[in-house]
Structure formats: C-alpha cells, structure tokens
C-alpha cells in the first residue's frame, strides 16, 4: 500500500530487504504471502516470520501473489491481472491455480500437494469477489482444506534448571 509492503494486519513489514524488494508502487494492490525459503518446508512459517520480522538481514524471500484487489470482477479476472503485473518482477511468484470439476479431481489435486509437503489446499470460487480477511464457509469465496488439527497452548508455569542435561548435538 503506497509503496510499503504490509502484513495481513496492515502493519509495515520490518525487514529492510523485504521493503526494498516488495515495497514498490508497482506492486500496490497485490495480495499474497511472503515466503522465506522452500514454500513446502516444514518450518516455512518459522523461517518466514524470523526473516521478515528482523529489521536487518537479507532473507531468501519471495512474494507468492494470489490476487489483485485493485481489479474489479471475479477472482479469475483479478488473478489474470495480478499474473500480468508480476511476471517481470524479481522474486515474485504466482500461486498455481487449477480448475477442479468434481470430487475425484479435488481429491487428486489435494493428494498431489500433500505429497509435495504442503499442509493442504485452498479452494476458490472463480467468480468470487475480493474479500480482505477470511471468507466464511457460507460465502464459499475462499475455503481452506486442511485435514489435520493444530492448536495453541498457554504456558502456565516452568521450572528453571541450573544445568543443561540435553544430549549434545552438532549443527551440521
């Protein structure tokens, strides 16, 4: 927005390198996700958060673009516009999209991405409007298909130890 790379909560991304790469007016209006390293890596969230939230450093970051909220019309039209806008941009990737026509194709598509290491897939209505934030199941504009449950826990206490009894390991 206004030549500044922003987070989902509309706060500027702190990393100077990320701002240099993606905080440019020609990328205004694009919606996507910053990824540090391999997009299907098990620790991609941790690596990305660490890379983009550190002010200094040059993370191996790319911008995976999946929408353009400056374009009117349904998703298919907006994505086509986004793709045209990023195809010559350094470190920008378009998120692959595939049309599925039935449940069998959907299950195959999901299985293919699970085998690549992704945690699930996103389903989109090709004519759906842009919506900032999350779509509801009732709207059916954008749905997440992730077949496992993850959770967060609150730490309610700890006991500090005076020695490290962990097995010694070498970081290769």
Task: For each feature predicted by the language model, list its residue ranges.
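Classical nucleotidyltransferase
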Residues: 1-33, 135-172
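Covalent nucleotidyltransferase
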Residues: 1-93
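Intrinsic-disorder/low-complexity, polar/charged segments
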Residues: 15, 74, 101-106, 167
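Short, surface-exposed loop and linker segments with low hydrophobicity and enrichment for Pro/Ser/Thr
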Residues: 54-59, 112-117, 166-170
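Hydrophobic/aromatic-lined pockets within catalytic cores
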Residues: 70, 87, 114, 159-163
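Conserved protein kinase catalytic core
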Residues: 73, 130, 163
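Intrinsically disordered or highly flexible coil/loop and linker segments, enriched in small
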Residues: 75, 91, 115, 119-122, ...
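Amphipathic alpha-helical
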Residues: 97-160
